[in-house]
Amino acid sequence: MKYIFVTGGVVSSLGKGVASASLGALLRARGYKVTAVKIDPYINIDAGTMRPYEHGECFVTASGAETDLDIGNYERFLDLDIPAGSNITTGQVYQEVIRKERAGDYLSQTVQVIPHVTDEIKRRIRAAGESAGAEIVLIEVGGTVGDIESLPFLEAIRQFRFDEGDDNVLYLHLTLVPYLGTSNEFKTKPTQHSVAALRSYGISPDIVMVRSKDKLPAEITRKIAAFTSVRENRVFSSYDVEHVYQVPLALEEQGLGKAVEELLGLEGTHPRLGVWTDAVRTIKHPKQQVTIAIAGKYTAMPDAYLSLMESLTHAGIANDARVNIKWVNAEQLAEAGAGELEGQFADVDGILVPGGFGIRGIEGKVKAAEYARTHGVPYLGICLGMQIAVIEYARHVAGIEDANSAEFDEYAKNKVIDLMPEQLEVAGMGGTMRLGDWPMELRAGTKIAELYGVPQGGTVKERHRHRYEVNPAYVEQLEAAGLTISGVTPGVEGRGAGLVETVEIADHPFFVALQAHPEFKSRPMRPSPPFAGFVKAALEHQQQ
């Protein structure tokens, strides 16, 4: 296997994930088997218990791992399911080292950062590549060079070149070149200092990639090359573009794929990037556009809904449309009257209620679902958004006026949403939900079955992340009131026909909700069926 390590300097949030994923896309387009690893130096075991406002969304893999959002970027850009073990944290590493010490695996040894912690880091990186059957492993080291948390990881990746040989290891360093408008110039000093800091840890970058507002002039590229001792044709400009899916094409135009092949001793191949070119063309020059309202509580931090936004983009590509997002703060909707609701939703073509946890903003989300139902506006509910749809329908159609969820009121009389029985004895928070791929058996003749291309009914898999479910005791009453239970996970103890996975309203233009998170499986060239159908319905609604 060959290894490409991506580090960052100057400031955080430069876009190492997008840069790494874009390079992976270029290598995949050349026919190489590629996988990706994200290293997060925090002490948490995973991203499952972090605040979305601080860390962005928690991306769930097929195996049920709760990971950093960059794993989602890798899956979308590489069009692959990233295997378990590909998000490495300090917490995981130290937990395993301490477990081994207690088990006697290091008997008679003094357990230290070097070699025990660094060896565990290297073992995990190699294992991730082997489990994916990869020829090339991309490893993004989170944080910024100089962070104290990153030191063991930098030492471990330094050792890789000694262990694996020069032709099998490549170091790419991403930095920032700010532009000062007052003096009308790009400033390279931060990049020079960042590369010097990286070298102080024994790592000399083979490639320097520079984030900047605009493409760097040739003289700035030459200056960076001279001061960092990196060849000029190995200094690349990662400048701002209209959409992230332009990044692979922009980097390929500069020769990044070819440079990587040369440095790793790979035979030069011609990339097949036609699908990327077509997708970018549609994104930049769509034939039509729609506006979708997302009624959530993390609207001030769009990264909390990153996969949702990308799924809407993918659905837009499939429908040759630009999808404009209108963020609606669900907390503010809670006290809104009819006039205010009309003001929020009159100009939108669809309403989406995303997943989430906790009571904050819930009544506002219920009002959003009610507006969509009563005004014939296309509605897509995701995870909590499905539970909201059920609560709203129970209250206003099925006559269960005090319907609620046990999550919001554990003493509610009519808990149409309840804690799953399997969760009753669960004590811990981390990694204990119903996670990862689960089968959904779709009923023949339903909208959801049509969307997934199985109109006669069939089983599909989607990813999940939840503790609560539709209470099976209310299914018969809800169905009698006209709510269609269109998909279930069969064979779940105590659930009768099955655990409710999807609901819809038959006489509504498009009212579909899923317990699953289909956004986690959506790809630029393979959009999620519910999202593609939702955007199509929004376009049709727009024409009315």
From Swiss-Prot:
Annotated binding of Mg(2+), by residue: D70, E140
GO CC, any one term: cytosol
Binding-site list for CTP: S12, D147, I148, E149, K187, T188, K189, P190, T191, Q192, K223
Keyword field: ATP-binding, Glutamine amidotransferase, Ligase, Magnesium, Metal-binding, Nucleotide-binding, Pyrimidine biosynthesis
PROSITE patterns: GATASE_TYPE_1 (PS51273)
Binding-site residues for ATP, renumbered to this chain: S13, L14, G15, K16, G17, V18, D70
Region (Amidoligase domain): 1-266
Active-site residues (renumbered): C383 (nucleophile), H517, E519
Domain called Glutamine amidotransferase type-1: residue spans: 291-544
Disulfide linkage: none
Binding site for L-glutamine: Y53, G356, L384, G385, M386, Q387, E407, R467
A single GO molecular function term of this UniProt record: ATP binding
Residues bound to UTP: S12, K187, T188, K189, P190, T191, Q192, K223
InterPro entries found in the cross-reference section: Class_I_gatase-like, CTP_synthase, CTP_synthase_N, GATASE, GATase1_CTP_Synthase, P-loop_NTPase
Pathway noted in the entry: Pyrimidine metabolism; CTP biosynthesis via de novo pathway; CTP from UDP: step 2/2
CDD domains: CTPS_N, GATase1_CTP_Synthase
Reactions mediated catalytically: UTP + L-glutamine + ATP + H2O = CTP + L-glutamate + ADP + phosphate + 2 H(+); L-glutamine + H2O = L-glutamate + NH4(+); UTP + NH4(+) + ATP = CTP + ADP + phosphate + 2 H(+)
GO biological process, one term: CTP biosynthetic process
UniProt-listed Enzyme Commission number(s): 6.3.4.2
Means of activity regulation: Allosterically activated by GTP, when glutamine is the substrate; GTP has no effect on the reaction when ammonia is the substrate. The allosteric effector GTP functions by stabilizing the protein conformation that binds the tetrahedral intermediate(s) formed during glutamine hydrolysis. Inhibited by the product CTP, via allosteric rather than competitive inhibition.
Described purpose of this protein according to its UniProt entry: Catalyzes the ATP-dependent amination of UTP to CTP with either L-glutamine or ammonia as the source of nitrogen. Regulates intracellular CTP levels through interactions with the four ribonucleotide triphosphates.
Additional record remark: CTPSs have evolved a hybrid strategy for distinguishing between UTP and CTP. The overlapping regions of the product feedback inhibitory and substrate sites recognize a common feature in both compounds, the triphosphate moiety. To differentiate isosteric substrate and product pyrimidine rings, an additional pocket far from the expected kinase/ligase catalytic site, specifically recognizes the cytosine and ribose portions of the product inhibitor.
Quaternary assembly: Homotetramer.
PANTHER family: CTP SYNTHASE (PTHR11550), CTP SYNTHASE-RELATED (PTHR11550:SF0)
NCBIfam families: PRK05380.1, PyrG
Protein known as: CTP synthase
Gene behind this protein: pyrG
